[in-house]
């Protein structure tokens, strides 16, 4: 038939296969009539096809025909259901919350209204719960602060109302405590200055009132003392002129005497070397 679309799949692309295996047969497709339509008004096996096993081709089909999303929410192939859920009417999505495939539920977590999104807070798959933590209303977010996955809790710490952050200041994972330290208010921030993880203390040092930095001048990690040198008042800076680390000494000198020329090789600050330094 001369009116059929020609396949535009690039050379060397993944071969077109039916999602159940075997070749794609347009004659048995419910959307066979689309083959006679031009360009994005139609469909193309190997390029934009709802029968294909390749998710990219399914996605292209629904981008060409988003109005067909509702009709495929119960399709037996999970990739079709997941991609159809991106385009379906939102009010149709709550019925899919118990879908057996996490790929589908992940798409739901990106689109569900808040009233239904909370139902995915106990999803068995971490990626779904992470998306929930990224979108859940702050007033409801606290339900995820004790999630077993640190990635979920990290997003909670990024978005939880500041007044509730002290509840996460003792999180067992230091990455979560870093996020808490980036946002928590005094006096709870002061407690994190004594955290067992250096990166948490460093973030706390970058935010503490300058008058309280004196308690960190003997911190065992040079990065924490360097943050102190960046912000402390002159009285504290003078004590850091004899610090064991050249980076810290150089920063203290630079802040005490910003126009003073470098007088010795030891006065030259090395480039910031990160967590592996010394």
Language-model regions, residue ranges each:
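Long, contiguous interaction/recruitment modules in multidomain scaffold/adaptor proteins
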Residues: 19-22, 26-29, 123-124, 129, ...
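Repeat-mediated protein-protein interaction surfaces in helical alpha-solenoids
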Residues: 64-68, 138, 162
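N-terminal alpha-helical scaffold/docking segments in eukaryotic complex subunits
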Residues: 1-94, 98, 102, 226-278
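Alpha-solenoid HEAT/Armadillo-like helical repeat scaffolds in large eukaryotic proteins
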Residues: 68-76, 94-103, 111, 118-124, ...
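Structured C-terminal portions of repeat-based eukaryotic scaffold domains
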Residues: 209-210, 220-222, 233, 265
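Structural detector for internal amphipathic alpha-helices that build alpha-solenoid repeat scaffolds
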Residues: 41-61, 78-90, 95, 103-114, ...
């Amino acid at each position: 038939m001369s009116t059929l679309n020609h396949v535009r799949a690039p050379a060397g692309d993944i071969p077109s296969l039916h999602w159940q295996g075997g070749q794609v047969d347009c004659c048995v497709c419910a959307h066979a009539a689309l083959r006679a339509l031009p360009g994005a008004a139609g469909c193309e096996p190997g390029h934009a096809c709802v029968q294909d096993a390749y998710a990219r081709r399914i996605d292209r089909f629904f981008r060409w025909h988003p109005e067909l999303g509702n009709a495929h929410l119960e399709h037996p192939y999970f990739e079709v259901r997941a991609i159809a859920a991106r385009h379906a009417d939102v009010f149709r999505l709550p019925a899919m919350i118990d879908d057996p495939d996490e790929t589908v539920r992940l798409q739901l977590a990106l689109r569900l209204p808040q009233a239904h999104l909370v139902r995915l807070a106990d999803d068995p798959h971490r990626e779904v719960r992470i998306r929930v933590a990224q979108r859940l209303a702050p007033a409801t977010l606290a339900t995820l602060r004790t999630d077993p996955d640190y990635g979920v809790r990290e997003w909670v710490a990024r978005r939880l109302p500041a007044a509730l952050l002290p509840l996460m200041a003792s999180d067992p994972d230091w990455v979560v405590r870093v996020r808490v330290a980036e946002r928590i208010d005094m006096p709870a921030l002061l407690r994190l200055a004594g955290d067992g993880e250096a990166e948490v203390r460093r973030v706390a040092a970058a935010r503490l009132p300058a008058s309280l930095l004196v308690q960190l001048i003997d911190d065992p990690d040079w990065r924490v003392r360097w943050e102190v040198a960046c912000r402390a008042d002159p009285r504290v800076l003078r004590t850091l002129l004899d610090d064991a680390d050249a980076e810290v000494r150089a920063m203290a000198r630079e802040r005490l005497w910003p126009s003073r020329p470098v007088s010795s090789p030891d006065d030259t600050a090395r480039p910031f070397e990160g967590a592996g330094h010394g």
